[in-house]
Curated annotation (Swiss-Prot):
GO biological process: response to antibiotic
Superkingdom of origin organism: Bacteria
Known role: Specifically methylates the adenosine-1067 in 23S ribosomal RNA. Confers resistance to antibiotic thiostrepton.
Family named by the database record: Belongs to the class IV-like SAM-binding methyltransferase superfamily. RNA methyltransferase TsnR/AvirB family.
Binding site for S-adenosyl-L-methionine: R135, R165, G218, I238, L247
Top-level EC class as recorded in UniProt: transferase
MF-aspect GO terms: 23S rRNA (adenosine(1067)-2'-O)-methyltransferase activity; RNA binding
EC number: 2.1.1.230
Protein name: 23S rRNA (adenosine(1067)-2'-O)-methyltransferase
SUPFAM superfamilies per record: alpha/beta knot
Amino acid sequence: MANLDVIVDRSDPAVQRIVDVTKHSRSVVRTVLIEDIEPLTQSIRAGVEFTEVYGLDTVPFPGDLLAACEKRGIRVRLLSAAVANQVFKTEKKPKVFGIAKVPPAGRFADLESLSGDVVLLDGVKIVGNIGAIVRTRSALGAAGIVLVDSGLGTIADRRLIRASRGYVFSLPIVLATRDEALAFFRDGGMRPVVFEADGKLSIGELDGIDERLVLVFGSEKTGPSGEFAGVATESVSIPMNPAAESLNVSVSAGIALHRRARRNLSRPRG
């Protein structure tokens, strides 16, 4: 294990960078704090540009993460216990974390260049659900995700990074208005299908559709908006126990993506 430099002085410029990035009142987000081993590792693999990665001098720095940083030329240092206590006064101290530049937002053009299905989440605001869908998409091969009325101002939201385990940077995620999304899918040559409790197609029939689909999901309470239901060529339902009120949206998306995995995983990613 390499001997890592330890930051012991509160006046080190890195300390102020860390303090600045943890402020909740920032109006313009250009940098983000990414914490924990898996989100850091996935972000590094996705090509996110890091200023520096840090650990605590009281905890061994993970060897695999150090190797990933060295491969990318990312500097790694440790915080002394005293400095860490000053920086994270009101927050739980992460054992490993990094300061990264926020990547550019995803664009509809990024989706056009890919071949897999697209997931559209309409009015889904629970970040944990969005993060779970991002992880499932990474495993099952859809091209990307469009978020409409999600309440998120950036894909670099720390809650989303944590919930997605860092996979949020591994695929195009487009933050769009409803009108922007409708215009793209009208002109983009993809077939929108909306998921509803009384959908006409069963989930099993998705496996036989050899076209690029837009899989449209709404919130559990209200479902997709009428605008998206109006442009969808088909509606799909997932059979379940009549005594159950609904499925969690991340579970529904996972079931749908599993049904589409044969097609999506067989297509080139680029």
